[in-house]
A protein has these predicted regions:
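Helix-start (N-cap) detector for alpha-helical repeat units in TPR-like alpha-solenoids
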Residues: 24-25, 58-59, 92-93, 126-127, ...
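Register position in tetratricopeptide repeats
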Residues: 36, 70-71, 104-105, 138-139, ...
Length: 352
């Protein structure tokens, strides 16, 4: 619906509400129109007004809970969902939404409890099984995750998200051929999805099919999606095939597309360090730090590069910076102690 038409309907509805201020259905219609416009403040305002006159309206309570959920205020979200649940304890959607809140809080057992209650009330809803699968996936229990994705797909075989997520789980389980089949099925359903093309290319990379992998990366580049991410994944694949010249060019292209993100600088620096271009890698780590100055990992890698370049003093300084940002990182402290020992020995050697 065009915005002009929506505004016209809003005006007509507001006029009706002036005559019938206690007509609950008008409030719901108005909130849906504002939702269609993406005006979430207005949606919240309308639902609050509705709850003033009908405090036990479950639809409004769930709506408020969902709005606060997307605002990432999960406590307020849960408050509204719980109130809705006391009024209607047989609504599967409320249990599902509460499960989502606990999933965001990484409370596995409570999230699973509420998702299972939702299934008790509606066992034919694929999204609930998908949510449980994601829960297990986040817990790195890929076998259970796979089982729930398969259940979700038995209900809705063309659910693109379930197919992609199942493909990713199969990838984690080293079932690369199965993952590839799933990703290709998704690509038939969503041929304009650049990230699906990348998933296919990544699977082909692991399966050592360079020509096909590169063909899908090239296809992804034509889809005009997240080109920065595509170039980075393409570069990683090129590195796997030991085509370091191509990998470097692809990282440089990613940097050209978004010079304010640190990932490509970091990965290119790692590539340069791994191919004995130490001084260039040092420069690239420094560029990454200009973009993201408080990254302890970058300082640690810079320290390693300086150490390989026999510049012990600069290595010490870089590791100190890493420790100052991440003081609880034992690995940084251990490496720093070894580098510091070398530094002390080198100073002693100069003084002898």
């Amino acid at each position: 619906m065009e915005n002009i038409e929506i505004n016209k309907k809003i005006g007509e509805l507001v006029a009706k509400m002036a005559k019938e201020p206690n007509n609950i259905e008008y409030y719901h219609e108005l909130s849906e129109l504002y939702l269609e416009q993406g005006n979430y403040e207005k949606v919240m305002s309308v639902l609050k007004s509705l709850l003033d006159i009908a405090p036990e309206d479950v639809r409004a309570l769930v709506g408020m809970g969902t709005l606060w959920f997307y605002e990432r205020d999960f406590r307020k979200s849960l408050e509204y969902y719980n109130k809705a649940l006391t009024i209607n304890p047989k609504n599967f959607l409320i249990y599902y939404n509460i499960g989502n809140v606990y999933a965001e809080w990484k409370n596995f057992s409570k999230a699973l409890f509420y998702y299972n209650r939702a299934i008790d009330l509606n066992s034919a809803n694929s999204e609930i099984y998908n949510a449980i699968a994601l829960l297990y996936q986040d817990n790195e229990d890929y076998v259970e995750a796979k089982a729930y994705y398969e259940k979700a797909l038995s209900i809705n075989p063309e659910n693109v998200n379930s197919l992609i997520d199942l493909g990713n789980v199969c990838f984690k389980l080293y079932e690369y051929e199965t993952a590839l089949k799933l990703f290709k099925k998704v690509f038939v359903l969503a041929p304009d999805n650049d990230m699906v093309a990348v998933c296919i290319a990544n699977a082909l990379t692991v399966m050592k099919d360079r020509a096909q992998a590169f063909a899908y990366f090239e296809k992804a580049l034509t889809l005009k999606g997240d080109l920065y991410r595509v170039y980075i994944c393409y570069a990683i694949s090129a590195t796997e095939f030991k085509d370091y010249k191509l990998a470097r060019a692809l990282y440089e292209k990613a940097i050209e597309i978004n010079p304010k993100k640190a990932d490509a600088y970091m990965l290119l620096a790692n590539l340069l360090a791994g191919t004995d271009n130490i001084k260039e890698s040092i420069d690239m780590y420094k560029q990454a730090l200009r973009v993201e100055p408080n990254n302890s990992q970058t300082y640690a890698l810079l320290g390693s590069a300086h150490y390989l370049d026999n510049d012990i003093e600069q290595a010490v300084a870089a590791y100190r910076a890493a420790i100052s940002i991440s003081p609880d990182n034992d690995e940084y402290r251990l490496i720093y102690s070894h580098v510091m020992e070398d530094y002390v020995n080198s100073v002693r050697g100069q003084n002898d």
